[in-house]
Amino acid sequence: MYPQGRHPAPQTPGQPGFKFTVAESCDRIKDEFQFLQAQYHSLKVEYIKLANEKTEMQRHYIMYYEMSYGLNIEMHKQTEIAKRLNAILAQIMPFLSQEHQQQVAQAVERAKQVTMTELNAIIGVRGLPNLPLTQQLQAQHLSHTHGPVALTPPHPSGLQPPGIPPVTGSGSGLLALGALGSQPHLPAKDEKNHHDLEHRESTNNSISPSDSLRTTSEKHRGSSDYSLDSKKRKVEDKDSMSRYDSDGDKSDDLVVDVSNEDPATPRGSPAHSPPENGIDKPRPAKKDTPRRPASVASSGSTPSSKTKPPEHNDKSSTPGLKSKAPTPRNDAPTPGTSTTPGLRPILGKPPMEALAAPALRTPLTCPTPFAMMSHHEMNGSLTNPGVYAGLHISPQMSAAAAAAYGRSPMAGFEPPHMRAPGLPASLTSISGGKPAYSFHVSADGQMQPVPFPPDALIGPGIPRHARQINTLSHGEVVCAVTISNPTRHVYTGGKGCVKIWDISQPGSKSPVSQLDCLNRDNYIRSCKLLPDGRTLIVGGEASTLTIWDLASQTPRIKAELTSSAPACYALAISPDAKVCFSCCSDGNIAVWDLHNQTLVRQFQGHTDGASCIDISHDGTKLWTGGLDNTVRSWDLREGRQLQQHDFASQIFSLGYCPTGEWLAVGMESSNVEVLHHTKPDKYQLHLHESCVLSLKFAYCGKWFVSTGKDNLLNAWSTPYGASIFQSKESSSVLSCDISADDKYIVTGSGDKKATVYEVIY
């Protein structure tokens, strides 16, 4: 069928050679593959080794970071003690005779002259007087680990060795680091385990990264103390969490407040703050900062604590409100929380109980100078909550850092990825190493720390501090407070009622009257007295405003004003008491004629709930802040919007200075910004560590107060924000008011009470 030529041709002499070439090529490819595989294996081993070394370096970094915190806390504490002792000496010296005064003065001056040699002798650095400070520290640290003293070569001028913070001033804080490193009593068991660890690491290059994540103290434990099994480590993490309790209920117990250790200072009374744009002593830690790295893993990974988006939430006692990120769930009971079901959702500001509950943050949301950090998840390798699971620092390391988690007193200790977003490293501290908390922001966005004048905290009308004189147990989360004029009665708004307290009677523990308004399960968000003190207007999570007649023998409802919005977040009264302005959850500003009890106008502009409001002293201009990240001003004579200021954060509170010019704005981002009503310049203040929930100017206009979810009450000078005093309460501070004579401050908080402070001048 097919031609003969189609049959297979006879083999040619070259064909066997072709077969040999294919086999040889296959062998060659196989050899090359094996070579590449060996090379790959070698590189993989090297990679794992480098990963282990990196993890080890990060672990050491965390240890040094904790030590730095503790030592700086101790340094500032000792500095404050020295200042107080100097003040006592200065007060006592005039009682001495002239001759003794001179002798004592000379002795005091001699005591202040501490040389480097004496410091080295005190902390046990002998024989190394001429070495640079960082090399002395390394020498001491290596000496107690029984390793050779391998000093690093000097670094180029102006540069610091990695992992060692820059030394500012006399460096006394880091000199103490050497004292810690030179402790001679390393336990024998630790020494043995240390050498065992070195042997294991040198003989096993492919040790898994998870093993190397164990910290020094974990490796020093006996083999019965832990297992490599990940399930058991999760159990240990859970135990660690139970030791530290939840962020919700017991985190206040973990606050380290060295400023209140003086027994002469009453609980709750604020410590005096220096006029510098920085601190002389640490301020109280907030509850949503990590207590210590040991609790990093057990804190859990939670989203940044923004408020809920609008949704049906049958488990919250207050309706869910719109924001940009979900509120993390907190299973632990918190002050002021309730599980009343069946409440309808309302758009707008965060729920009161969400604000009252302690904030939950991502682990390692670093405690920083005056909350200049991002309150969201940080960038960088340290944010993974699983990286340092079960991280425990050895007793030698953690002893000095027990009180470490207040605000960082020295900004130089923060790595670049842990600084405030948008805040250059050069701005986080000023001369002397003190962290700046007040910044001037120019029209082009340039930020500079504010140099406070010498009389920043001195002068008529500037208070020295405030002391707590009364606690009013309301029984529910206090979302609104106001003080009568003259100062006699305090009005506290909670869930479904306003209670009236007579603070002119010392020790009064019960209200003189209770005004039931709105629905029983709805929170009062604002209550305002008319200037005559005879009428109270109440607004909250309902569509009606209630007008109370207080002049009658028994307070009674005089009228109700109904709007189309489901909630009112804030109220303002015109100086002539003829008009009431209400911030509505739909973003509108309702204008009410109080005489005719009618709605006369609505200002429309906010695209989300209007959260806060204030009116100028002459009654011609209105300022409003909203959850749409804007602050707007309105001309009340012409009924139009004048200005709009855009921010990167939701606006929770604002106040307009009674003397004009300045507007202070409290934000969800924890900043307070002070704006000029005509100039583009502004001041940015960084003492709060969570959202700023309320703000109020003193009637003299020289100072104002702000309160926050971080439990803090801060008093600031106008306009540049020198810190006058600070008080820490036991829960989120949701509302505040100042009496007309500027002598009293009242705050409402999430632990179901209001606190009355007397302002001391």
Swiss-Prot record:
WD repeats lie at residues 473-511, 519-558, 563-602, 605-644, 646-685, 687-726, 728-761. Ubiquitinated by XIAP/BIRC4. Residues 205-274 are annotated as: CcN domain. GO terms for biological process: negative regulation of canonical Wnt signaling pathway; regulation of retinoic acid biosynthetic process; sclerotome development. Keywords: Nucleus, Repeat, Ubl conjugation, WD repeat. CDD domains: WD40. Pfam families: TLE_N, WD40. Residues 1-140 are annotated as: Q domain. Belongs to the WD repeat Groucho/TLE family. This is Transducin-like enhancer protein 3-A.
